């Protein structure tokens, strides 16, 4: 047993230090990034925010809506191949280039991924997703997927430390998904005691990945636009959002009427709700590591994503970054013990 004494930080522990800026308006900030990926050699241009591959977030409807903003969607893995075929027929190329095909690591998942990727050459992103990215099986599976799809962009995770980040990139991942336990409906940290403060995870994994020419997705932990900016400032190439994009008409969640109000069900992908729906319940050897909540119905996602991107633009103006690419270079975090004045609580 050993204890690491170094302080690890989450988004709530820091604020940006403002810096002199020549920008006159948020409208001058460019949030589009141009990436060339290490293994596939593929190029992509867009706003590097991703809707999470959760049942009640990463839907086909969400993909079409967010593509209008240049934003990506990691479509959840529970759609059938026929569902994908219908989507590919109805979606334009601008949408398809901003979609990730999510998969698990079984032989059936591998065959399903092959069938989906064969539907269109415009599908270029594969998201290999398991809760514990420290499994040797994941490394072997990434190698298998890379051998089958040498020209596709592969994301794999989730991990929170530089060593495993490097191993996945060397195995063939272009992007590593970073985050264990920070999600709004994730209970892994309290159920298992395992986790890592998200900002420190992003900083450390980003440093490791960039040293090898790879990239990272900061997955989870964002509760407001300022957190999205902090993830980018800490070195995330992409930021994945679940709870912030849940509860919308495009989210695909179950709508529930209660006491005259409309709610949408939102749950973690290791929750009792998810396992009841997709796995016939929680296996005897497992424990649920997610919770189910009812969110007030929030209408269309367009207003929400515009608000998030507007917040990130505003961050850039405060620190003098004309492009999102410059944000991490312009970032100085200060440690704090408070974030906001809560005299009046949340706005109704």
UniProtKB/Swiss-Prot annotation:
Annotated positions binding NADP(+): 108-131, 216-239
Function: Catalyzes the irreversible NADPH-dependent deamination of GMP to IMP. It functions in the conversion of nucleobase, nucleoside and nucleotide derivatives of G to A nucleotides, and in maintaining the intracellular balance of A and G nucleotides.
Protein name: GMP reductase
UniProt xrefs under SUPFAM superfamilies: Inosine monophosphate dehydrogenase (IMPDH) (SSF51412)
HAMAP family for this protein: GMP_reduct_type1
Highest taxon, organism lineage: Bacteria
GO molecular function, one term: GMP reductase activity
Record key words, sorted: Metal-binding, NADP, Oxidoreductase, Potassium
Entry-linked InterPro entries: Aldolase_TIM, GMP_reductase, GMPR, IMP_DH/GMP_Rdtase_CS, IMP_DH_GMPRt
Subunit organization: Homotetramer.
Residue positions of the active site: 186 (thioimidate intermediate)
Entry's family note: Belongs to the IMPDH/GMPR family. GuaC type 1 subfamily.
E.C. no: 1.7.1.7
Catalytic activity: IMP + NH4(+) + NADP(+) = GMP + NADPH + 2 H(+)
């Amino acid at each position: 047993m050993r204890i690491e004494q170094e302080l690890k930080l989450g988004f709530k522990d820091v604020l940006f230090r403002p810096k002199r800026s020549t920008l006159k308006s948020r409208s001058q900030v460019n949030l589009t990034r141009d990436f060339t990926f290490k293994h596939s050699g593929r190029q992509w241009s867009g706003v590097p925010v991703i809707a999470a591959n959760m049942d009640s977030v990463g839907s086909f409807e969400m993909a079409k809506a967010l593509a209008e903003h240049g934003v990506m969607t990691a479509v959840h893995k529970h759609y059938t191949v026929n569902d994908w075929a219908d989507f590919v027929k109805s979606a334009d190329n601008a949408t398809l280039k901003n979609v990730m095909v999510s998969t698990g690591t079984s032989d059936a998942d591998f065959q399903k991924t092959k069938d989906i990727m064969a539907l269109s050459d415009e599908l270029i992103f594969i998201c290999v997703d398991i809760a514990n990215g420290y499994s040797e099986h994941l490394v072997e599976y990434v190698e298998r997927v890379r051998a089958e799809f040498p020209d596709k962009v592969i994301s794999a995770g989730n991990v929170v430390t530089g060593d495993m980040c490097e191993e996945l990139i060397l195995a063939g991942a272009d992007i590593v998904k970073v985050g264990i336990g920070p999600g709004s409906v994730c209970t892994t940290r309290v159920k298992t005691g395992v986790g890592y403060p998200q900002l420190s995870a992003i900083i450390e994994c980003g440093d490791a990945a960039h040293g090898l020419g790879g990239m990272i997705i900061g997955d989870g932990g964002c509760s407001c636009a300022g957190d999205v900016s902090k993830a980018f400032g800490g070195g995330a190439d992409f930021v994945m959002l679940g709870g912030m994009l849940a509860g919308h008409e495009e989210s695909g969640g179950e709508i529930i009427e209660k006491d005259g109000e409309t709610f949408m069900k939102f749950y973690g992908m290791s929750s009792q709700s998810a396992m009841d729906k997709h796995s016939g319940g929680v296996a005897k050897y497992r424990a649920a590591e997610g919770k189910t909540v009812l969110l007030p119905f929030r209408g269309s996602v367009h207003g929400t994503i515009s608000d998030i991107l507007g917040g990130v633009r505003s961050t850039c103006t405060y620190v003098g970054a004309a492009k999102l690419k410059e944000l991490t270079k312009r970032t100085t975090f200060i440690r704090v013990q408070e974030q906001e004045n809560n005299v009046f609580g949340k706005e109704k």
